[in-house]
């Protein structure tokens, strides 16, 4: 029962061919000249088919691992969850820690241009905790937990073995108390160990730091992950590679044999201004990332706006300039208060204090040579022109490739301009920076690119399609007692015929009770499906493109036909609150809710254990519904005791191939996800009523002030735009550029790449008038790309998964080694962007239609705003802006119909 993770209004949410049936039991992995294997989600279960769901069987966690190891890991995880049942709130992000160094992995010194190094696991790795680096924790306990993961990035003949290959176990060992309280980068060990999550005890080396910061805590554990060789951080190799990082292949002797692993050095180990001498054939310097800087580096220029997404202060309020990067911030906007138990520095931003990287393919503001800031896009190292890779900063730690995004007239055939800049000179683009654009044209471009990336940014995270940890035939009680009801009727019904006990003439069926077992003595009884654990043969489990797994009809299902029982753990109110609170504490935006209210304070939760019914998705326009019935338990002197169960039944005819859906009808819990079913009557929530805004005591006064201020703001915006339009008709100022204004009509809209393209040859005489505009000069670190044609291959730039492919003709020493796994990665074509309607805040002229802050709702609002309607009205969309650490900022966008 997965909430939609994408735009549910799309037509491509049908089951995918080839993913409908799950494979059978897996055999232990044997390494025999294997170059590639399909990646298996760490912690995801595996099902044979819907026929196997009548067994109470636990799904394997790592399909390639030996079964005895899987069984042992399951028992260890259950024992840990039983011992540490109380969920610990680590007070993140208010209190956090730095990323712990890997003291037990010794890496030999290497130079900035070397791609290989030697490593060795020290003897202390088997006896000390990787967090506190001690044998005993603060309470004096010396018990160590062994990580259930495996070393990432194993290579063979110069190629990375794709997939999670359980060949070499992770060497991390840790105290339970140390790992539970370790929350660097939003890591939450206790939450990841839950049976509905990863169901294993994993250290941070198996969790993508970028996905975790973006609150995608299920995607963080799947896919190809690269470990940092110097600290307990890891990143998805292709989709979340940190800008400013560099690769390092580490050779480690394991079992008497040298094994090579592809790792990275993350940009958190970059020291600005460090005394670094490069490769010399007579003398090799020490590892560049371990050298102490000469002195504190003072940044010469900063972005004069707060870098915190949730900033609510005026743009004119005074900001603090970060001493280690180009960002500025308000002291009250920072969420982090203490780091390693000490107050954070007053003159550093959160990103520098916590070492948060910027993923590649992210919109940024980057500093130009004249200390001005321009819109750019971070790129992979190997998107940089081959002929210019001799640059001294190419693949250097702390530097990244950026492509400048500047509008130009009639430059469709010209190539983009790229630079190599230090990561301390870039900052992720936020709405707070829009006011810094030098003119309206640049501001429009910044806003347009920001909206484009906002719709696709998190799609870079691996798509997760998980199965249930354990399968149940019927529901079971979890730490609560059944609330049985007595039914004073011991007589068997008088139903006859082949379809007996299917009509309301059956006294048990009419009272919503199942027949007692003795009814089967008269013939086949059709009113005992729930007790017998029957699942309709007309349904199948299938993976969708945007909603995880779903349940589809493989034959016509008639109205009122029984489908299956909704199976799970039956929990009470206290346990329900505890489970929902743990999701809120963990800040997991991918958490799925499988709870269905039963009766008298009891709830069925299918998150950990269940059957195929847990995969039935929610819809505000369903074709099935949940019903309550009473099932026979035992006889008494006066009658029989019955228990309450819930089951799914069709409420209209369901054709072959249609997805089966029903309305969850949950109470309006604050921490439940929004509905994304995409139905015309979507209520915006999975609850029983439409989600309304909370009322305040002085709501009328605040509303009046808000309307008044919005009117003034609207008039000011119109005046400002008219003035800028007049200025654009005349000569521009020297500090501004005057490119053509991007079109907003769907007919003439251009792709991301076409608007961002840069000419191969430029008329420098015409550009000298605009002194602040980037120009390619001889001897600078800039170069124009001549071999990469982004107009023919826009997916190389726009794909949420970077290709990271090496050019064979590279002149750098790194290109001389064997080809890596990047040569085999294919880029994906980006989705076609539709024209965005006006986002002006206007006065409401009719009935306002409210939608939740979801992609499907925004898509629907945009569609409505372009339709011809008899009486114009305003379409409101509530949008959530989420900061790096989870602060949620809600705003309302209004689309004026055309």
UniProtKB/Swiss-Prot annotation:
Post-SET domain span: 671-687
Expressing tissues: In adults, it is predominantly expressed in the germline, and weakly expressed in intestinal cells.
Span of zinc fingers (PHD-type): 126-214, 303-355
Biased composition (Polar residues): 36-51, 774-788
EC top class named in words: transferase
Start and end residues of each SET domain: 537-665
Effect of residue 206 to Y: In bn67; suppresses the multivulval phenotype of the lin-15A/B n765 mutant
E.C. number: 2.1.1.357
Ranges of Low complexity composition bias in the record: 737-751, 761-773, 802-811
Pfam hit, one: SET
Biased composition (Basic residues): 705-719
Alphabetically ordered keywords of this record: Chromatin regulator, Chromosome, Developmental protein, Metal-binding, Methyltransferase, Nucleus, Repeat, S-adenosyl-L-methionine, Transferase, Zinc, Zinc-finger
Recorded phenotype for the gene knockout or disruption: Derepression of X-linked genes in the germline. RNAi-mediated knockdown results in sterility. RNAi-mediated knockdown suppresses the multivulval phenotype of the lin-15A/B n765 mutant. RNAi-mediated knockdown at 25 degrees Celsius rescues the larval lethality phenotype of the mep-1 (q660) single mutants.
Family classification: Belongs to the class V-like SAM-binding methyltransferase superfamily. Histone-lysine methyltransferase family. SET2 subfamily.
Role: Histone methyltransferase. Dimethylates 'Lys-36' of histone H3, a specific tag for epigenetic transcriptional activation. Plays a central role in early development and is responsible for all H3 'Lys-36' dimethylation until about the 40-cell stage. Indirectly involved in the global inactivation of the X chromosomes in germline cells, possibly by excluding the mes-2-mes-3-mes-6 repressive Polycomb complex from the autosomes. Not related to transcription elongation. Required for small-RNA-induced H3K27 trimethylation. May suppress sensitivity to RNAi.
Record's protein name: Histone-lysine N-methyltransferase mes-4
UniProt source species: Caenorhabditis elegans
Gene that encodes the chain: mes-4
